[in-house]
A protein has these predicted regions:
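The conserved acidic donor/metal-binding loop of glycosyltransferases
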Residues: 58, 62-66
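Eukaryotic basic, amphipathic alpha-helical target segments in cytosolic regions
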Residues: 14, 49-52, 80, 169-172, ...
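PAPS-dependent sulfotransferase catalytic core
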Residues: 202-228
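Short, acidic, metal-binding catalytic loop of nucleotide-sugar glycosyltransferases
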Residues: 1-4
Length: 228
């Protein structure tokens, strides 16, 4: 699409190499679990930057979307304005960083999203590719009380991508890392974690209705898994 590569990313914990690019499929040596989505995302960004010269950024898409190709092509056009961290959330609000942002990140809440997910996906604990043996999900439910782009589909610029890589390198890509600054576990839910990393590093979130599922706007995608 307009010289933008389309790459499908698959985690393979037992891959001998760090990554393998096979056509449009990028296999990354990491867990292929829901809990490890952030790790898979950032590692894939790191390796894609080794493989390709990325001029603008990355449009991160879930695997449960119906794409409107005409709207996608319009978005990818160089003349379309794109922000460093750009997507849509249910609140329909931007988040603009300020001198008080880091204090705001210290506000935390209990989020049972992953607990509820794994309550109905118990077989995942038995899958060696997921590397969840002896992981007690309930211990990692506290996270910063923030909003940002929903993980369905969002755009991150090269600046944002570099920020994600540098931040995750510092914690050795450990999504169960305890963050002493917020006294929480910010990295277990991918979209929440991306928001946290962006705001911690002073990158704003810009909301737009053009990404997905807006009845009043022509969007890039329809989220087919919305109600499951």
């Amino acid at each position: 699409y307009n010289n933008w590569e389309v790459i499908y990313v698959i985690g393979d914990l037992f891959l001998k190499e760090n990554y393998v690019l096979d056509g449009n499929f990028l296999y990354v040596r990491c867990e292929d679990s829901y809990l490890h989505l952030l790790k898979k995302l950032v590692l894939s960004i790191k390796y894609l930057n080794e493989i390709f010269i990325i001029n603008k950024g990355i449009l991160r898409c879930g695997d449960d979307l119906i794409i409107n190709e005409n709207n996608l092509i319009k978005f990818l056009d160089d003349r379309t304005t794109k922000y460093d961290y750009y997507g849509h959330n249910p609140y329909g609000k931007n988040y603009i960083c300020s001198g008080n942002t880091r204090n705001e990140l210290k506000k935390i809440k209990k989020d049972n999203f992953m607990i509820n997910y794994y309550a109905s996906h118990c077989d995942d604990f038995l899958n060696p590719q997921h590397n969840l043996k002896n992981v007690n999900i309930s211990l990692y439910s506290m996270r910063p009380d923030i909003y940002g782009a929903s993980g369905v589909i969002y755009y991150i610029s090269n600046k944002a991508c570099k920020t994600l890589i540098l931040h995750m390198e510092k914690i050795n890509y450990n999504i169960l890392h305890y963050d002493s600054f917020t006294k929480s576990y910010p990295y277990t839910i991918e979209d929440c974690a991306v928001s946290f990393i962006m705001y911690f590093n002073g990158i704003n979130f810009i909301n737009s209705y053009l990404f997905y599922d807006s009845p009043l706007h022509d969007t890039i995608a329809k989220h087919t898994n919305k109600h499951k």
